[in-house]
Amino acid sequence: MRQRVIATAKILFFIPNLRFLFEHGDEVKRLCTEGGKTLFWSSNFSLGVSIFSAVNKYLAKIMNQFPAYDVTMSETHHIHKMDAPSGTAITLAEGILENLDRKDKWVEGTFQAPDGTVSGSTECAANELSISSIREGEVPGIHSIRYDSEADSITITHDAKNRRGFALGAVLAAEYTAKHEGALGMSDLFPFLKD
């Protein structure tokens, strides 16, 4: 198994794959920690997404006081991206669920395929957070979170213009990893993510 190979190797690891760690994360982290290995994991290495994630959590804390606002999410990526919703969208959703008492799980909303066909629905229970996904063109990644009430809407968006932000974050993470041990993530690199 991949995780046993990881545990016996004598190198540092980056795993920018959310699905793999959702399935094997606890075991991989345990094997790395027990074996004196270093693992740095993130669903997204972008510096901008890290900042956006902190803003997202803070906004969810504020919105917890205002039940008239419902929250939804959308993510847009290039046509080659197969998973939906994206790992970044799931991570952002988890940040909302941690801070907004009226939501306790995320669900897949609509999915717009590269050919324009739409499946799924944005309809969900009051305790669910809908994440809609769009696949079009060569979009590096757009994530939007919208709080909507009868009076107004509040929307925050991160729009990657290219892959430079991902590369910068990966370099910063690699530099950090070279000086630290254990199971690490973006909240270790950027402590503001822990708030």
Predicted regions and their residues:
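C-terminal substrate-binding/catalytic lobe of Rossmann-fold NAD(P)-dependent oxidoreductases
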Residues: 65-195
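Cationic, amphipathic, low-complexity alpha-helical segments enriched
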Residues: 1, 5-18
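Aromatic/hydrophobic pocket-lining residues that form π-stacking "cages" and hydrophobic walls in ligand
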Residues: 1-5, 28, 59, 92
